[in-house]
Amino acid sequence: MFSRDVRLETYDPELAKAIAAEAGRQEDHVELIASENYCSQLVMEAQGSQLTNKYAEGYPGKRYYGGCAFVDIAEQLAIDRIKQVFDADYANVQPHSGSQANQAVYLALLQPGDTILGMSLAHGGHLTHGAKANVSGKLFNAVQYGVNEQGLIDYDEVQRLATEHTPKMVVAGFSAYSQKIDWARFRAIADSVGAYLFVDMAHIAGLVAAGVYPSPMEHAHVVTSTTHKTLRGPRGGIIVAKGASEELQKKLQSIVFPGIQGGPLMHVIAAKAVAFKEALEPAFKTYQQQVVKNAQAMANTLIARGYKIVSGGTENHLMLVDMIGRDVSGKDAEAALGKAHITVNKNAVPNDPRSPFVTSGLRLGTPAITTRGYKEPDSIDLANWIADVLDAPTDEAVLAKVRDAVTAQCKRYPVYG
């Protein structure tokens, strides 16, 4: 019998110390990695529940194990809620991650060797959109599109590549693109060559849910997302669709299970259900609106300080700082900002002369700081501190001054109050 009174710090002090230190880091450092956010205590309560003990291969009402009545309720809540969030008529909440959701879509609709047309990782796409290092670039013939000199998707070039290569699937979505995407234009391009349009909205799902960013649901054959990032849930994936044929839905269902996964993570699915309920609250829309306001305030401030933002600004939650031609690399900037308790990630920018391990750019995002309660004035202060560090990345006095300012700001806006 397990005791309910045993504590991790007593049983495993080494691990408990690491967890406590990470909790402290999250409170004391400002988080600007665009793909990170903080989930609520309610989400964490569900994810830490006894549902982790239950195996439930299959889907609600059609399990291969007994004793699934209550986890069926949890999964059906998640399905029903995410359909409501995105106005979808199909949803699968079992993918363990966004990458696995993407893999499921590819394997459900394509054959090895088929051609896909996706956004280049070097221009803002994602590994799973056909990068050579990823299975999507190994199993399939991946053709890549990018951005023009203004940092914008060149739809004429996408059309040209589609006409030339006749892909079976066009992939739209990004991990580092700060403007709105014309989903209707992408669908027209896909239709012109008889291809599926697959949208990966992992980064912008929360913005889409709140009506702050255009929804791809009316245009894509199938859509995937992570459930963290702007959606502010546990780490995981989903597949959704609107107007999908019964045949397409069956393909998606069967490829997730039994195709690429076995038992679903019922504790994570329960946590997803909580996050989806939160996404239906009026406060969620207000939050997403503020995410964009904060991002625009930061971008405009950095531009005023002489830093180039790829595409000239942002219409979503993120921005790419282009430092080509500057002495400081993305890697060095990330390290310097880290010393000042500002957490970012180095990122390649279009036509980057440096290696992917060094880069000439930084990706900044505002979902996490907005969860803390930051508004535009706080974001402007933060952007100025970032510029101070980038102007003098090896000046210990500057780093110390910014670190003190960040610490004071974080204390004003605790993650978990």
Swiss-Prot record:
The gene is glyA. It catalyses: (6R)-5,10-methylene-5,6,7,8-tetrahydrofolate + glycine + H2O = (6S)-5,6,7,8-tetrahydrofolate + L-serine. The record marks 228 as: Plays an important role in substrate specificity. Belongs to the SHMT family. This is Serine hydroxymethyltransferase. Homodimer. The modification N6-(pyridoxal phosphate)lysine is found at residue 229. It is found in: Cytoplasm. Its EC number is 2.1.2.1.
